[in-house]
Amino acid sequence: MDIRFQNLGPEHWKGEIMLAPVCQDEVLTEICPQMDKAAPWLAIAPALRDFKGKTGELALMHGHPELAVPRVLAVGLGPREKVDTAGIRKAVAAAVQLCRQKGFGSILLPEPALARLPGGRERLVEECVCASLLALYRFTALKKAEKDEPAEPQWLALGFDGQEVPDASHAAARKGENAAWAVMLARDLASTPPNLLYPEKLAERARELAREKGFACTVLDEHELEKESMGCLLAVGQGSGRPPRLVILEHAPEGHEQEKPLILVGKGITFDTGGISLKPAANMHQMKADMTGAATVLATLAALAQEDAPRRVIGLLACAENMPGGRAMRPGDVVRAANGDSVEIQNTDAEGRLALCDALAYAQKTWTPAALVDIATLTGACAVALGTQIAGLFSDDADLAERIRAAGGACGEEYWPLPLWKPYAEQLKSDVADICHMGPREGGAINAALFLQHFIQEGVRWAHLDIAGVDWVSKPTPLCPAGPSAFGARTLLELARGGVL
C-alpha cells in the first residue's frame, strides 16, 4: 500500500473511505470541521446516531457512491482522558483491516483529526502510517493466491487542510513507512521455514540487502570462525549439516565513519531442536523463529541505510542451526570462547547464549562501542516471568536501559528491567572450566544474562534484551497475524535514530 498526501483542502479530498477517529461521547460532525467538509452528508447518516466512540467500536457510514468521499468509518478511541498512542495505533490498524475485508482500494486519513489527539502531531502521523501498513501484513510467499480474496488497499492518503504538507509531517510519514518495512522484513525472515532459511541462506539474504540498500556486509564462515577462536558458536552448529556463520553489517554514513558505533548483536538460531537435550515435539515448529533477534538486527541495519540515518551502527548476526547428531555438542563438553575462557556446557538447549557470547567478545575485540545491545529469544524463564507482552531488559547502565525503554515505549514495544543479581554469578562456577554456561532452573533468565555479562569488558555500556515470549503471537491482533511478531525491530530502529548515546 502506497502512502500519499492530499493538501488541496477537505473539499478536494478523495478516497473510497475516510477514517474518522473519535473519542467517546464526542460528536463526530463537530470535532473536526475538515471531516464535515469532506463528507457533508455525514450529519444525516443514520449510523451516526448509534455511534458512541467506545474503545474498539467501528461504524461504517455510506453517502452517495459518486461522491469523492462516499464512505466514512468512525473509529472509536474510548474516553479522551484514557486515549494514548498505543490505543490510537491499535484502533487505526483495526480500521484498516476492516477496509481490506470490505475491498476498499483507497483510504483517506485526515491529518487534522490526528492533530487534535494526545500524542504529538508528527508522532501520530508516524505511528498511524506504520500501523496501517502492519495491519495488512501477511506471510504469503509460499501460498497460492485465494480466488475470493479481496484486493489489498492500493493507497492511504493523509489529508491536509489546504496547505503545503509540512516537512515534519512528510518526514514522519516516511519514518513510519520505513519502520513498518523493517518489521515486515523481520517477520518474513522469522516466518520462513528452516529448510529454506538456514545460516548460509540468512547470510546470503543479508548480502542481498546490503547491496540493495547500501551498507557493508561481511560473512565469516566456519573456517574463519575457527581462526577467530569462536568455539562456542561453532559448538552450537556442529551437529548440523548447515555450518554456522557470523554476519557482520555496518551502516557508516559519510562523516560518521570514525565515530564510536552502536553495536547490535542478534541471536540467529535458524532452527532449534534443543540438540542432544531435545525439546518436546509440541510447538517445535515455532523454533524457526529462534532467529528473531538476528532478523530484527538485520532489518534495523537495512532500514537505517534506507533512510540514510546519521549514525554509525554495526550489527552482528550469530547464526547456527542447533541439531542432534553424531557430531553434536553434548552435555558435559567444554569449549573455548572467543575471549579465551573455557565454557562447560550442561544443557545443549541453552545454545543461544553460546552463540551470543562469541559475538559479544568479537564485537569488543574489533571495535570500541558507544553501546552494545544484544537481543535474543533466550529463555523460557523470561516468558514465564513476564508473559507474552513485555520483554526482559538487563543492564547495569541506567541511562542506556532508560533509553531502550523509552525507544520501545514510543513504538509499542514494552520492556521490564530485571536484575543482574551478582550473588547468582556463583551458580555459574564450574569444576572443570572457567565458567558454566547455565545455572539452576530458578532465576533462569537472570543466570543467562549473568553468563553474557561475563563476556562484557569493564566500562562497556551493555544491555541484554530477552524477547522470549513476545517473539510469537498465538492469536492475531490488529497489528500482527498469528506467528512471528518481530518484536524489537522498532525498538532498535528507534534507539539508533535517537542521537548520541
Curated annotation (Swiss-Prot):
Entry cofactors: Mn(2+)
Subcellular location: Cytoplasm
Pfam family for this entry, one: Peptidase_M17_N
GO BP, sorted A to Z: proteolysis
Protein's UniProt name: Probable cytosol aminopeptidase
EC number: 3.4.11.1, 3.4.11.10
List of catalytic residues: 279, 353
Alphabetic keyword roster: Aminopeptidase, Cytoplasm, Hydrolase, Manganese, Metal-binding, Protease
Molecular function GO terms recorded: manganese ion binding; metalloaminopeptidase activity
InterPro entries, per the entry: Leucine_aapep/pepB, Macro_dom-like, Peptidase_M17_C, Peptidase_M17_leu_NH2_pept, Peptidase_M17_N
Binding site for Mn(2+) 2: 267, 272, 290, 351
Family to which this protein belongs: Belongs to the peptidase M17 family.
Gene Ontology CC: cytoplasm
Cofactor annotation comment: Binds 2 manganese ions per subunit.
SUPFAM superfamilies: Macro domain-like, Zn-dependent exopeptidases
Catalytic activity: Release of an N-terminal amino acid, Xaa-|-Yaa-, in which Xaa is preferably Leu, but may be other amino acids including Pro although not Arg or Lys, and Yaa may be Pro. Amino acid amides and methyl esters are also readily hydrolyzed, but rates on arylamides are exceedingly low; Release of an N-terminal amino acid, preferentially leucine, but not glutamic or aspartic acids
CDD domains (alphabetical): Peptidase_M17
Domain of life (superkingdom): Bacteria
Protein residues bound to Mn(2+) 1: 272, 349, 351
Its job: Presumably involved in the processing and regular turnover of intracellular proteins. Catalyzes the removal of unsubstituted N-terminal amino acids from various peptides.
Gene3D superfamilies: Leucine Aminopeptidase, subunit E, domain 1, Zn peptidases
Top-level class of the enzyme under EC nomenclature: hydrolase
